[in-house]
Amino acid sequence: MTESSDEEISSLYIHLYFDEDVSAGIVESLRTRGFDVLSARDADALGKSDDEQMLYAVSQHRAVVTHNRVDFEKQHRKFLERGMKHYGVIVAKRRRDVEVISKLLALLDAVTAEEMQNQLRYI
């Protein structure tokens, strides 16, 4: 059995970037559970375009979590059409925070960071 590096272990878990439309309560709930989360507010990226948000998430090796289905479906397609890699887009239907958290936790439990690459998932 070989030893895994911290980087290999951390790559098993999806690192999340929440755009500004997602509730701060959702971000904090996942953060207190020990997940690696970053919000647009944390990144001083409030008011940035969807292109800028997506590029920032990619630069940080993070999957985007958003309620903005239409625009981030376009971002996903654009990346694929250009042969560019992204770390995933998770579109969360607008619902109570506790429901979004539950859906995110189920996804995080079932999907690795590697499996999430270039994927568009709906919760």
Which residues does each PLM region occupy?
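Acidic, PIN/NYN-like endoribonuclease modules and their adjacent C-terminal/linker elements
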Residues: 2-11, 15-20, 24, 29-32, ...
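Conserved BB-loop
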Residues: 36-48
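Acidic, metal-binding active-site segment of PIN/NYN-like and related structure-specific nucleases
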Residues: 50, 58, 62-75
